[in-house]
Amino acid sequence: VDTDDWVELFPIRESIFTGYDTLTEKVRIARYRRVTSKGKTSYQLVFDRTPFYGNSGGQVGDIGMIESANERIPVVATEKENGLIIHIVNQLPENPAAEFTARVDPEKRQAAANNHTATHLMHEALRKVLGAHVEQKGSLVTPEILRFDFSHFQKMTPQELREVEMLVNRAVRANYPLEENREATKEEAEKCGAMMLFGEKYGDKVRMVRFGSSVELCGGTHTSATGNIGFFKILNESAISAGVRRIEAVTGERAEQIIYAAEDTMRDISDYLHNPQVLQAVKKMFESNEALSKEVETMRREQVAQWADKIIASTPERRGVQLIATQTDRTPEFVKDLAYCLRARAPKLVLVQGSVNDGKPMLTVMLGEEITAQGVNAGAVVREAAKLMQGGGGGQAFFATAGGKNPDGLQAAIDKAVELIGAQVK
């Protein structure tokens, strides 16, 4: 970022903010400078007075327009720096010394003000529902969404979240008017029970904002009455660090959209199930699915048992073992179940099974009781054989598996496993 020096048109110590009372103001540029970042140029303007709120206290800055007789220039952001309110524009006015009319975007300001007031109401509701240990740890207020970080030791329950929503919406319906004291002393604020941020440094005079029983020290913009918020809805609650939780919420039309979306989803589910009683239909579907799953599992086990009987019957014992060494396209679950089924039927079993799943080779070795009694270890066998398919594995003395990267080496791994076992069987 390349920032030029300020061009001063007339001296100014700090910006006069008039945005609590008006969204339109006659202004003059006191100083300006050019900023270049990533090849893009913007300009920062400081007015003698301004209705634009500068990004601070968790609330994003206003956007809007500055107008003169000859031009209209969008204000794309407003920041605050060293007591100055800085307006970001993408072009410098033709005549910086002219008088301008500064106009805040009223819809964006109202939406942000509604969300800021809703944040205060939620803060109070959280303390009522969770306890007085709740303290603000951070916040973000935009026209679209509000975010509030607070101290709490565990995840909030659905019932607690519902209680917070109900308390906030009760305050919204009560339509509490904004009561503010811009010249309150810290002592007066303490007597009123105003919420103060821990570690925050306050001046001799503070701005105290009240909506019903919610009282906080705050420099942000607020709605004129809680009824303007319309409706409050929590989107989610999560942990951001040890002992700190975060709630994201929306108000007004955005909150309504959340409800409409949920209703649409329920309607789609109801139509899909052909049943207006969604919960009962879903329960019935799960019960039916569970019963079908049990039937399928029973059939699968029977199939595995039949397959095992067929393999045993067609595999004669040779040199003291029943050797089964093949490749299969069966799933790993089927291969494992088959291996255990074969072991239960053949005490002299040597099963070396290879398969490829999702392009990756897998080797399975199962040994009968009489084979492991001779000291043959399936885990040691697969570890050595798997090297031929660029893999590794292990397991128990009687059962082990290995995975690899090279399916072209699977047959060689099978042959190696048979060779290693054959060398140890007496």
Where are the regions that the model predicts?
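A glycine- and charged-residue-rich anion-binding loop/surface
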Residues: 1-426
